[in-house]
Amino acid sequence: MEKNIKFPVVDLSKLIGEERDQTMALINDACENWGFFEIVNHGLPHDLMDNAEKMTKEHYKISMEQKFNDMLKSKGLENLEREVEDVDWESTFYLRHLPQSNLYDIPDMSDEYRTAMKDFGKRLENLAEDLLDLLCENLGLEKGYLKKVFHGTKGPTFGTKVSNYPACPKPEMIKGLRAHTDAGGIILLFQDDKVTGLQLLKDGDWIDVPPLNHSIVINLGDQLEVITNGRYKSMMHRVVTQKEGNRMSIASFYNPGSDAEISPASSLACKETEYPSFVFDDYMKLYAGVKFQPKEPRFEAMKNANAVTELNPTAAVETF
C-alpha cells in the first residue's frame, strides 16, 4: 500500500531567528519517527546544483547508457518476463572524497564535470558536519561528538554514489534499487526533481519522498541508530522504476572511518542497552553480503563474532 502523507521538510534558514526552536524540534521529530527529512535553504548554490545535474545526465548519455543496455542484455533483462528480485535497474559509479579522492581516476569524466563534483562534494561534506552538530544539539551531546566518533584515527569516509534509473518497460517486475537501510552515518541526496521513485517504509506503508527543486534529502544510516541507542532510526527505503523518464540521483555518504569504534553514547545508553559496540569496518564487512536483509539481525550478529560469519559467510569482503 502506498500513501501520500506530509513528508518532513526543513527550512534551514529558520535556524537563525525566532523559529529556531521549532525548526530544531522538526528535525528531531523527523530523526525519531522518519529517519528521513528534506532540507531547503541549505546554502548550496543553485547554479552548482543545476550544473551537477546537467553534467551528470550528459555523462550518463555519453558514457553510461550503453553499458547499462549491455548489462540488461547480459542478464537477459530486456523483456522482463518474470519478476526479478536479485538485480537492480540502475546505472551507477562511485566517487570517493575522503580519506583519499579517486575523482581523477574515474574514466570518461570531463574536466568541467570533475571540477563541479569536487566542489559539490566539499560543500556536502561541510553540510554533513553541520547537520551532525545539529543532531548533537538535539540529543544533548556535546558539539562535535558525532564527528569525533566518526573520525577514528584515520578520519571519516565520505563518498558519492552517482546513479541513473532509466525508464523501465515493466516497473512491476523490477526495482530500481531493492529495499534496504544504509549502513553508514548520514546520507545527503540530491535527487531528480521531475522523475519520482524514492520511497521509504513507514508504519508498514511505502511513502513517496517528494522531489523538490534544489532540495537535499537527508537520511540516517545504521551507525546513527546504534550511537543514539535507537532514539534515531535508519529506515528501509527503495527506488521504484518508472515507465517514463530517467531519474538522476547523487547520494553522498558521510560515514565513520574504517577503524572508528561505534557504540551507544554513554549519556543515551541505559542498563538494558540493546545495541552492540563494534569497529565500523567489521560492520561493513558483514553488511556487504546482507544489505537487502533486515538490519536487526546485523545488530545482533555484531555482538558475536561467530554470528557474523553465520549471517554472512563472505564477511571478509570489503565494500564502499
Curated annotation (Swiss-Prot):
> InterPro entries from the xrefs?
DIOX_N, IPNS-like_FE2OG_OXY, IPNS-like_sf, Oxoglu/Fe-dep_dioxygenase_dom, Plant_2OG-oxidoreductases
Answer yes or no on keyword Oxidoreductase: yes
Q: Which domain of life is it from?
A: Eukaryota
- Where the record annotates domain Fe2OG dioxygenase, the positions are 156-256
List the cofactors.
Fe cation
Q: Name one GO molecular function term.
A: metal ion binding
Question: Catalyzes what?
Answer: 1-aminocyclopropane-1-carboxylate + L-ascorbate + O2 = ethene + L-dehydroascorbate + hydrogen cyanide + CO2 + 2 H2O
List ligand-binding residues for Fe cation: 180, 182, 237
Pathway this chain belongs to: Alkene biosynthesis; ethylene biosynthesis via S-adenosyl-L-methionine; ethylene from S-adenosyl-L-methionine: step 2/2
Keywords attached to this Swiss-Prot or TrEMBL record, sorted alphabetically, are:
Ethylene biosynthesis, Fruit ripening, Iron, Metal-binding, Oxidoreductase, Vitamin C
Q: According to its UniProt record, what is one Pfam family this protein matches?
A: DIOX_N
Annotated EC: 1.14.17.4
Q: Which residues form a coiled coil?
A: none
The keyword Calcium appears for this protein:
no
Q: Which family does it belong to?
A: Belongs to the iron/ascorbate-dependent oxidoreductase family.
Task: Please identify the protein, giving its name as recorded.
Answer: 1-aminocyclopropane-1-carboxylate oxidase
State the organism's lineage. Eukaryota, Viridiplantae, Streptophyta, Embryophyta, Tracheophyta
Gene symbol here is ACO
